[in-house]
A protein has these predicted regions:
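Acidic, His- and aromatic-enriched active-site or binding-groove loops in soluble protein domains
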Residues: 109-124, 157-181, 208-210
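Polybasic, low-complexity association/targeting segments
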Residues: 1-12
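Conserved small/polar residues in nucleotide/adenosyl-binding loops
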Residues: 228-234
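Metallocofactor- and cofactor-centric catalytic cores in central/energy metabolism, strongly enriched
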Residues: 35, 62-63, 68, 72
Length: 238
């Protein structure tokens, strides 16, 4: 059996269950209200019930949490002076790669190929807690299907990126998310791929995942009927 199983696996490293992080870094009443209110506002903007423009802005990804938090403080103050825009901070912890490269704060928080994902998840959840405590809603791309169990309660807007929008795994995951979800058009530029993804995510699904206790589970979803929408790349002509 040793000659046919796990031939290319070097090691299995157990990881802390989501519930441990949720208990250690609980969401405060203030942050919970920020998340709940901002999800409603974003949904209203997407459906044309709120005339403001949704502006999701921030670093390409978070690698320095101290610098990221300083940015969040400045953005929070700036957002108070803008009336026609609803500002949400881009807080991306996972980076899909076309080939190879650094995969983000969760995957390798020390940027040294040690892949201390326990530390990465803890840092990510702590950072989300710090940002929402300022009153700033957050947006992130969900890449690994396990990640939402660790972080989603702090997130107001979720993204499915160009490299994963055609993936059944990510369409299923999106069908169970509790916030508005934007699907990007595919890497080849096809909008239809994202439209199909939106339709798939609006349906009910059953798929393999984990629960808050970290147990392998069959996840049954209701579908994000009123939450999915299309996101397109912006080209600035100067």
């Amino acid at each position: 059996m040793e000659n046919i199983r796990d031939i290319n696996i070097k090691d299995y490293s157990p990881i802390t269950p989501p519930k441990v992080f949720i208990d250690e870094i609980p969401i405060s009443e203030k942050s919970e209200n920020i998340v709940s209110d901002s999800r409603k506002i974003i949904s209203d903007i997407v459906h044309g019930k709120d005339n403001r423009i949704l502006l999701i802005t921030g670093p390409c990804s978070i690698h320095d949490v101290d610098a990221g938090l300083e940015y969040a403080k400045l953005l929070t103050e700036f957002s108070k002076s803008i009336k026609n825009f609803y500002i949400v901070m881009r807080v991306y912890f996972e980076k899909p790669r076309t080939t190879v490269g650094w995969k983000g704060l969760i995957n390798d928080p020390d940027l040294n190929n040690t892949f201390n994902m326990d530390k990465g998840l803890r840092k990510a959840r702590t950072f989300l807690n710090d940002v929402t405590s300022l009153g700033m809603p957050t947006a992130t791309e969900f890449l690994d299907p396990f990640t939402p169990q660790y972080l989603a309660d702090f997130v107001s807007w979720g993204a499915i990126g160009a490299r994963t929008t055609e993936s059944q795994t990510h369409r299923q995951m999106a069908s169970g998310l509790s916030m508005p979800v934007g699907f990007k058009n595919g890497t080849g530029g096809s909008i239809q791929i994202a439209v199909d993804a939106m339709g798939a995510a609006q349906g009910e699904h059953a798929f393999l995942g984990i629960n808050e206790d970290g147990q392998s589970s069959i996840i049954h979803t209701t579908g994000t009927v009123s939450y999915t929408h299309l996101t397109l790349p912006t080209i600035l002509l100067v």
